[in-house]
Swiss-Prot record:
Protein name: tRNA modification GTPase MnmE
Binding site for GTP: 228-233, 247-253, 272-275
UniProt GO MF annotations: GTP binding; GTPase activity; metal ion binding
Subunit structure as annotated in this protein's UniProt entry: Homodimer. Heterotetramer of two MnmE and two MnmG subunits.
Chain residues that bind (6S)-5-formyl-5,6,7,8-tetrahydrofolate: R23, E80, K122, K456
Keyword entries, A-Z: Cytoplasm, GTP-binding, Hydrolase, Magnesium, Metal-binding, Nucleotide-binding, Potassium, tRNA processing
Annotated positions binding K(+): N228, T247, L249, T252
Residues that bind Mg(2+): S232, T253
Similarity field: Belongs to the TRAFAC class TrmE-Era-EngA-EngB-Septin-like GTPase superfamily. TrmE GTPase family.
Length: 456
């Protein structure tokens, strides 16, 4: 897609720095090169250059890079000027270029370089979003997963499903167009076999994207338990600061407290909640209700108990809690036995009837490293090579596609209607195509790229 305008932006951060970089992209980039450099640099070579103003006086000097279309970031002619990172010099160069006569050039909008790369087929929409995720990464896991998406791992999975859908639909539509010809295989077995293969592919990618979403958006860990078990003390220890008020009075915490922390490279949102108990206090009741809401929306629950209670009560309490949350979609539950300093017992991990217990002391710090390692390892087990970043819109589209597949299978078993099946497969194809950008509205593109920085 060739545009009739040219864009320019500073791609390095504003402010003083050793190097400042300007990027120009569009059909007039060559004229900008002639005006500012006096020539077009050798393609894809770093060329030492002087940057001239309109009166041919030197504004700055540095490196120029020329990438002729279509072999560039955006697929258009691209000129990069790398000079000294003085904001005043950067502004003078930008003004110089914007004031060039007979050239339609303007400041780039946020994410417009990446948007042009997408529109010109240099990257798909998943890769464009991965660039934004990579820039905003705060942990090593997010960096590696973003790079996997940028390198096309996520797109590869989506394209594999789309390819299978097209192959399936082609055979279906062939049977519609040439229904009078004999088909040398059991048609129903063929269709059910394809449903099974597609179902396996969807379940695999649904599992991967749910893990990728956790990496991008941080693991939500909710601390719950009875009053005075040490929930707030645990929050303070994990966050390495006095985030919550701690007293000997039951019910001190009456509202939800949030703290974002990094545990061994894993981004986590730790949530402290009001103690779970029966109470007549209206304010405390509201806090307890919010505690249950947090539990429902958590990725990992840390149920804190006082280790001084009997083993029988520990077991009874844990089993009762698991029954209470049996209908919730919670991935992990860990029972934390606090106040180990009062019993001077083993500090570590134990299992009782498939329930996991970790003994700690929030007061002395005993077992905290073990707990942190447990929390990070559970996530790192899912964060190996091949995992990619997934956004909410990706998960939503995959869920819609999978629901349509299940619906198509149900309708086939009920009606055996080939036209209806072919149309369902076409719908699934379009839903998945919205993830990569093959079928995407301009409003969605605008919303996605508007979150990017101007230089990208």
């Amino acid at each position: 897609m060739i545009r009739n305008d040219t864009i320019i932006a500073q791609v390095t951060c504003p402010g003083k720095s050793a190097v400042g970089i300007l990027r120009v992209s569009g059909i007039h980039a060559n004229q900008v090169a002639f005006a500012v450099l006096g020539k077009i640099p050798k393609p894809r070579f770093a060329t030492y250059s002087k940057f001239f103003d309109e009166s041919k006086k030197v504004l700055d000097e540095g490196i120029s890079l020329w990438f002729p279309a279509p072999f560039s970031l955006t697929g258009e002619d691209v000129l990069e000027l790398q000079g000294h990172g003085n904001p005043f010099i950067m502004d003078l160069l930008i003004k110089r270029i914007l004031c060039l006569k007979n050239i339609k050039i303007r400041i780039a909008q946020p994410g417009e370089f990446c948007q042009r790369a997408f529109l010109n087929g240099k990257i798909d929409l998943i890769q464009a979003e991965a660039i934004d995720d990579l820039i905003n990464s705060e942990t090593e896991s997010v960096v590696r997963a973003s790079l996997n998406s940028l390198h096309g791992n996520f797109s590869f999975y989506i394209q594999k499903i789309i390819k299978k859908l097209i192959e399936f639909r082609t055979n279906i539509e062939a049977s519609i167009d040439f229904s009078e010809e004999n088909i040398d295989f059991d048609f129903n077995i063929f269709i059910m076999s394809n449903f099974e293969k597609l179902n396996d592919k969807f379940l695999k990618i649904k599992n991967i994207v749910s893990e990728g979403s956790l990496i991008r958006e941080a693991k939500r860990i909710v601390i719950v338990g009875p009053p005075n078990a040490g929930k707030s003390s645990l929050l303070n220890v994990l966050s390495c600061r006095d985030r919550a008020i701690v007293t000997d009075l039951p019910g001190t915490t009456r509202d939800v407290l949030y703290e974002n922390i990094n545990i061994h490279g894993i981004s986590c949102e730790i949530i402290d909640t009001a103690g779970l108990r029966e109470t007549e206090d209206k304010i405390e009741k509201i806090g307890i209700q919010r505690s249950w809401e947090m539990i429902k929306n958590s990725d990992h629950v840390l149920y804190v108990m006082d280790k001084t209670i009997s083993l029988e009560d520990q077991k009874k309490t844990s089993i009762q809690f698991m029954k209470q949350i049996s209908s919730y979609n919670i991935q992990e539950v860990t029972f934390v036995l606090n106040k180990n300093d009062l019993v001077e017992d083993f500090c570590g991990i134990t299992k009782i009837e498939n329930l996991l217990f970790i003994s700690i002391s929030a007061l002395t710090g005993q077992g905290i490293d073990i707990l942190k390692k447990h929390l990070s390892n559970r996530q790192k087990d899912k964060s190996q090579e091949g995992l990619f970043i997934a956004r909410r819109r990706h998960i939503h589209q995959i869920d819609l596609s999978y629901c349509e597949l299940l619906k198509a299978q149900k309708n086939w078993l009920k009606y055996k209607n080939i036209e209806l099946l072919a149309e369902s497969l076409n719908i699934i194809n379009k839903l998945l195509g919205e993830i990569t950008g093959e079928f995407t509205s301009s409003d969605l593109l605008k919303r996605i790229f508007s979150t990017f920085c101007i230089g990208k």
